[in-house]
Amino acid sequence: MKILLNKSLCFLLSGIFLTFIFAVSAQAQTEKEIVKIRAEVAAINKGVSKYTKTTKDVEDVSLEGTEATFYHSAKNLKKITAKMYGETYNQTGEFYYQNGELIFAFIKRNQYDTQIGMDAPPKVVSTEERRFYFANGELIRMLVGKKELKTGEKYSELKDEIISVSGKLKDS
């Protein structure tokens, strides 16, 4: 019985150790991907003056309108900046692409105290920054302010929203 208990404890500790090693390894891989993404975003921003720039209004992105500027190098989309307006907010977005795939998005959202069009002009009551890092078509990190979101309803909602907005902008 004692030998069986020792073996069970040994297997349990081995499992915990391996789980820890895999988690640390996955975190290290994510950090490497983040470093690569940041380097690519910096390179895109450094070369932005060389890209072909096109600005247009885009439908079906936000309720009160969206103006987007597209930056292309040859036929490759590198970056989109967008000003998006809703009834109770405005937000700016920067979307970065590598080989046609979204790699990073930055959103700065200003929330109003009331709807636009009311008697008193709306005032910004809060500002929130969101950062989304993608590798191989998968979201690998989401930051809302300085807090990393990993799961949950808000995570799923924001992930779906950023993918949808990026797709609508790209397809316009």
Please tell me what each predicted stretch does:
Residues 72-114:
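Mid-chain, structured segments of secreted extracytoplasmic proteins
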Residues 10-23:
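Bacterial N-terminal signal peptides
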